[in-house]
């Protein structure tokens, strides 16, 4: 039979005494590392303390009662102090003023309120679930637990002229009769609790408080003083005196071993609390002190997790910034240099149990300014040492991973580096040194292998570099770890990272011979190889001139006519041009060798037959380190800009004297490396006059040269253009450029120079959705010759490419095409981003300059625009331009979008809307858009957007337009113009007007020459018709003498233009036609002489304007035709969401604004928004799980506004918390059932 006697029913007090860990935590004393105050040092120190969590908690409950009274006193008597006394015997007293407890009897329970609060379980004033409450108490246990676990407990309350006294003993079982008396109403309200914890129950052998617990309580009271710095908190009559949270945070700043002090803590205080990051000079385990509403959460919680994530997010930002400079940090290790303090005031905080050791509810963090924290973290003094240790660690990992420093055998290298062809001999002899020839690609490797003799292969290995090498300046080992080419090269040489070499004797090869193409890309590869070795092993290069050597091959070979088999080789264009100037009448044929693949094997054998004759030895000195830093260090942007701005990209050539056997770093940088940089910029940055890049200019020139109105496949045209224009960079890139030049959707080209026949792309993906080049056709558009008149062609300066005249250095269109179509490009140290403007406005601007306005005046009237755009351009708060789409908001959350900023694709917009759908902002999207029109219906959650500014921002319907111009000036130098586009207008105006002057002079001269020929012809014909010439008896000599005698004009040193005419030329009909031609030519000369260059320009502009106006009319009509009618898309609008009316800015002073098509709308101040600023770390964060990735910005379109998304997750509460919450709601009804529910 089961023994029934083991089943017990305990009273609530007995349950607390028997199972205190459920209510106050463990009552066993344990060794716990924690912060305590060291009076000798005046600092917080991390020590292991003997802590009794139960004892700490019952003291804490009384302290929190006092702290809660701060909140209660806001509406009553102001609270000014909390006084705590701890006697040597262990008796504890907590006293505070403020609002106090009402000394009245409860009508329901017939007892005084203080008696209920301090002597009856589940009594509380915090059951109303006030959402704004910031008290710590929630469950109605609090001070009663302290009473139960004390041998004696007394309370004195003085409130509003009445004073209450009551005491309890025997663990709250025995109580005195409440004593209430009247006192002077002027006396301050006071609440005083005095108790003697049952130290024996807590396991203290001497029945008194220990020294460690005194220190723990001292620290706990300091936390309370820091939390409520406006209240005077005293311990044993000594105030702590924290004026601000900074005073408290400084206590955690500890000096280093050498006495050096760390920087001041980073402290930010907001309405809902304070957060501090206290730096330490040495690493330690992550240490976080968290306090919520005065509760010290010894086990952390959501607020501690969120505070650490703010720090880690700032460190992530720092890591990304440093990564650009090749520097690496371990954010986890750097975070260990900080002690984090987070003291919050929160409404209705929830904890995992009655002990309140861990916060589990959602928190609202102080919004830490991003810029301030980023700058603070970047200035930490320990970062440099940390980065050095990371470099050492990474070097060790790389040495281990890639096997550097090991003298691997050829057999081992066969499997390690498959592309390496190792020298057959393992050592040098007195005559030959082991040389590793590094080639640019496999074709150059083949040339070297096929050209080296068997004897040379004993001492020469060959290794091809494929792909692009990486810049490892500043010992960027993280980048090196991703560059397999350099790793294999170092392994082949036997180099070890971090080791200092003074001699190459211990390496596998004693020389590195770089063999690249003789073009700009070859120069770049040489520079990257030199940079890598000088950065990682500078001593190797400085002590061994020629360790890196450069192999020089001819760039031009000529065969001189008339001299049998005489071939002259030139290793530089400078030498070749010098020879041309010395032999102006020489007849020769030239072959150009810009790529090593052009050389035959026979020629390669010639190069290597006397190999040393073609080798230049590189000399490196210590001072060269700074120069290479300037070229390759990402921080030296301004130096590189100045360096390149002084050079001419279109006239410069590599100017190294190849006849010399030594090459200094200075000569290499300033004479060869700069050539690569300039060529790279020339490919990416447009010319100010024609707005074209070299590839675009080649395409235009070849298409004009083609003289065909028939369209051709893009794939076929690319081959033709490559051939006639000497294009050397692959037809794929050329095809892509052809496609882009033909795109004419809104946001593509305002003026398309080529006609798109087929799928050339659309607004769906901003042109990236075009068909393959083999399927689409193109030809010149009607705008090409309107902008680039044929009469201009003979007056342009053409480029000599390998002996053939190809495209002009730059065209001079009738309008600055750069402003019509805009330009985007990223070069070497320079970038450009110029928006497009309406071509008719650009034409109006040119006309205004012709009429005398300055470029500075005119440019103020130009507003960025895309032809066909149906939205508006509005002035921004910082005077910038903002392209704004168009929408209408209707009832029931329906929103119709009829235009997007032209730089936003439809696909990017849909992607952005999808991300909003995931956060339930958008509930449905219906897209009716086409190739060049926007027509999208949305259903948005009602109330999610309250103003038009929120609609534009959240839906990415506004886009800032940046102007940051860099162009090539007319003389070919790089010219940063920033946001001022007036130089473009002025440069174009000067060049175009000069061209008209020269064109007029040339046309008059040509007409006068034609007139002279016609008049000479008429004179000869009249002489013949008068019978003075007998053709039957005449000889060639007599006819020539007759022409000389008549004073006729010579053409091409003869008179064939007259004497080779047919007999019908002398008829009456031909004579009359000749007379008419003379009259017509005379009239043309007269008209042209009366026509000024300006009038010629205006005539060309009139033709263009008329054609473009018709083109724009048809384009806009086609866009509007595709859109659904307003009867379908319309409806009752929501006034608060209606976009502001168009209010135009006043025109620039003195400008004829009416002559411009596009006008900017003035800045509209957004209505008051409830959105929180986004330039901070922190804010509302989730209560469960990691929040480090919460709030990632949504990117709907390039440069679109971004919005934070916060994921909220359900918090899993502990069983104790659930019981406490339920018990608090139901008061005492379930108290007898607690043991059954728990166990």
From Swiss-Prot:
Residues the entry annotates as binding Mg(2+) 1: 440, 517
UniProt domain Topo IIA-type catalytic: residue ranges: 685-1101
Annotated site residue numbers, Interaction with DNA: 468, 471, 640-641, 693, 733
Alphabetical list of Gene3D superfamilies matching this protein: 3.30.1360.40, 3.30.1490.30, 3.30.230.10, 3.40.50.670, Histidine kinase-like ATPase, C-terminal domain (3.30.565.10), Topoisomerase II, domain 5 (3.90.199.10), Topoisomerase, domain 3 (1.10.268.10)
UniProt superkingdom: Eukaryota
Annotated site, Important for DNA bending, chain positions: 826
Active site positions, chain numbering: 775
Region described as Interaction with DNA: spans on this chain: 956-965
Molecular function per GO: ATP binding; DNA binding; DNA topoisomerase type II (double strand cut, ATP-hydrolyzing) activity; metal ion binding
GO annotation terms (biological process): DNA topological change; resolution of meiotic recombination intermediates; sister chromatid segregation
SMART domains attached to this UniProt entry: TOP2c, TOP4c
Residue positions binding ATP: 65, 96, 124-126, 137-144, 354-356
Enzyme Commission number: 5.6.2.2
Further remark: Eukaryotic topoisomerase I and II can relax both negative and positive supercoils, whereas prokaryotic enzymes relax only negative supercoils.
Family that this chain belongs to: Belongs to the type II topoisomerase family.
Name of the featured protein: DNA topoisomerase 2
High-level lineage: Eukaryota, Discoba, Euglenozoa, Kinetoplastea, Metakinetoplastina
Gene coding for it: TOP2
